[in-house]
């Protein structure tokens, strides 16, 4: 059994995990694997199951907004430690409505099976994980480990002075300046 033990739960507050991407990308399969790995109580909300329960198959812009708010409300009502929600969330507004603690973008296909969704989908610029291959076990292990250790994708404040060193972008600080001044002095 693959259960991650790590640092345990991060405080007492429920954590919302959004698994989003095009239809057919593997969101549901990944959500199913991830729920097995997180400790404590885990609730999994699948968008199709929620739509079925509420008999709401409206995929217009307003219908999708309503669905994102519904997913948020259902997550907020939960007393679980983690709530995993897998839904397309094609627009930033829908992702923001859900207010995830962690966002997983399943980016494994170029186009989904529904043309209207393909046209509406805006690739996210903010996410914690970008899944690029359909290997749910591998990615669930990776994501669970990072969630349990609260390791996030690095972010930078591009308004601050930065420099590219050793092939990666990082904040510029006095130590870097000293290294460059020493190198230039030679």
Locations of the language-model features?
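Conserved substrate/cofactor phosphate-moiety recognition/catalytic segment
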Residues: 32-73
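Nucleotidyltransferase catalytic core that binds NTPs
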Residues: 152-186
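Hydrophobic anchor at the beta1->P-loop junction of P-loop NTPases
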Residues: 19
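Small-molecule kinase domains that catalyze NTP-dependent phosphoryl transfer to phosphate-bearing small molecules
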Residues: 97, 106-154
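Short, Lys/Arg-enriched N-terminal segments with co-localized hydrophobic residues
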Residues: 1-13
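Glycine-rich phosphate-binding loop used to anchor ATP phosphates in small-molecule kinases
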Residues: 62-110
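Conserved lysine of the Walker
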Residues: 27
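The conserved Walker
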Residues: 23
